Structures are given as C-alpha cells and as structure tokens.
Amino acid sequence: MSTLKKPDLSDPQLRAKLAKGMGHNYYGEPAWPNDLLYIFPVVIVGTIALCVGLAVLDPAMIGEPADPFATPLEILPEWYFWPVFQILRVVPNKLLGIVAMASIPLGLMLVPFIESVNKFQNPFRRPVATAVFLFGTAVTLWLGIGATLPIDKSLTFGLF
C-alpha cells in the first residue's frame, strides 16, 4: 500500500500545468478522510507512546539542591538563548544589539515579498529563501557555539 497516488500523466490538463511548473498539489490523496481519520491518530498515539516510553526508560534525574551562596564562575542562559546572549555580549553598544535582534524578524518578513514572483515550492528553485535560511542557520549555530566559549575566543572559536 502506498501513501501517494501516482499522477495520471496522460491527462493533458495536468501535463500543461506541470509544463508551467505548477500542478504539484493537483494530484494526491485528499486530506479528508485519509489524513484526518487514519494518519493523524497514528501520529498522535505514536507521539504519546514515545513520550511515555522515554519518561519510563529515562526519568529525569533530580540534581543537587541549589545553594544561593555558591554561584558558578560563569552563568549561562538556557541553550535556546545562547545566540541572543552572544549578540548582547559581543556588540559594544547594547542598543545596537537590541536593534540587531529586532531586525531579524523584520528581515524574515521581507523574504516573501522578495520571492513573491516565484511560484515554486521546491527549495532548490527558490534561491533567495534558501540562501537566507542557510545563512541564518549558520549564523545562529556560530553564535550559539560562541556563547559557550570565553569572550576572547567566542567569535573565532579559538582557531585564529
């Protein structure tokens, strides 16, 4: 049994749409009832089973009790705040750091308008969005890794 319906390439309307680069949603199984009644419950039950299984097999360990009089040498935020922490740590002017962080969502809001002429959903046929995504991912990883290092090695990772 296959989850995808093969397109009927003898259909002239479908061939015309595919020749224009359109028609990628023209064929396939309908969402109702196939996805909503059969696939979604399996995914939901599987997710719940995975969470319960991981909770049973590897329960969270309770750490040492907090000591308010013994602070660590370097206090780091949670891992998902490391890139933002690195921006605020490296940029000399804190207002400039906040402006840099606020410009990221504003820049991401511009990507659909830049690519509004592009009708393709394939990421290989959308070079601007793909380049923005890959550059943003690389910069985020670079900032996140750099936040865990001392300030003098944080931008170069100590390689230079």
Swiss-Prot record:
Source superkingdom: Bacteria
Gene3D superfamilies with a match to the protein in the record: plastocyanin oxidoreductase, Single helix bin
PROSITE patterns in alphabetical order: CYTB_CTER
Residues that span the membrane, as ranges: 36-56, 95-115, 131-151
Localization, UniProt: Cellular thylakoid membrane
Keywords, sorted A to Z: Electron transport, Membrane, Photosynthesis, Thylakoid, Transmembrane, Transmembrane helix, Transport
GO cellular component, one term: plasma membrane-derived thylakoid membrane
Keyword Transport: yes
Gene Ontology molecular function, alphabetical: electron transporter, transferring electrons within cytochrome b6/f complex of photosystem II activity; electron transporter, transferring electrons within the cyclic electron transport pathway of photosynthesis activity; ubiquinol-cytochrome-c reductase activity
One GO term (biological process): photosynthetic electron transport chain
Main location: membrane
Keyword Signal: no
Membrane topology: Multi-pass membrane protein
Pfam families the UniProt entry points to: Cytochrom_B_C
Entry-linked NCBIfam families: cytb6_f_IV (TIGR01156)
Family in the record: Belongs to the cytochrome b family. PetD subfamily.
Function according to Swiss-Prot or TrEMBL: Component of the cytochrome b6-f complex, which mediates electron transfer between photosystem II (PSII) and photosystem I (PSI), cyclic electron flow around PSI, and state transitions.
Quaternary structure (record): The 4 large subunits of the cytochrome b6-f complex are cytochrome b6, subunit IV (17 kDa polypeptide, PetD), cytochrome f and the Rieske protein, while the 4 small subunits are PetG, PetL, PetM and PetN. The complex functions as a dimer.
Record protein name field: Cytochrome b6-f complex subunit 4
Protein's organism: Trichodesmium erythraeum (strain IMS101)
